[in-house]
């Protein structure tokens, strides 16, 4: 039977661990609030970009652009797809990394001409271990999502899309459905789908617009910014999901320690 000194030592060890866990829990809570605020602050701007595209397409629905070209002439099995995969830089985040990596791996193996663009150290390590080539890895991004970092990712995938080296681009990230549920999610970034932009409210004012210098020139500017907005939103939402998962993991750890 343990003597009194051993019991006291054990109790102090548990208390010290709980203090550390509680401190980490508070840090995760703070980061979660900051991430949510960042997203809320930028949503109006990117919403206005989507509305601008919607207005153009309502007035010129027959517009032809590579940004809306679904390339139906290419068999689905032969399409070259790019997958931007958002993971964490470190573990101890519950199922957060497992779910998004599992989805990305399954999607990547569905074709022979796919490219991976990885955000987060754990994703890079996983795909390297599996022997899957990563086209581009983006460092120092997941712990500090910003518009600049989102634009860097956009520039790379837009470059390959404009060159014709990619037919479709997707982003795989973690969406926080509510305070309790998070799911791995896939969004198609390119090409854009016209039907996603042409659902106008019934009371929308059908004003006349004049497009100068051309619709394509306008889309050259607006579409990359729109894609950047989606990527940025995905980065922030993934970051918020990661912090939420860490918060839950540390809270459970603290409760487990306290019950011993």
Question: Locations of the language-model features?
Answer:
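Conserved small/polar residues in nucleotide/adenosyl-binding loops
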Residues: 249-254, 258-260
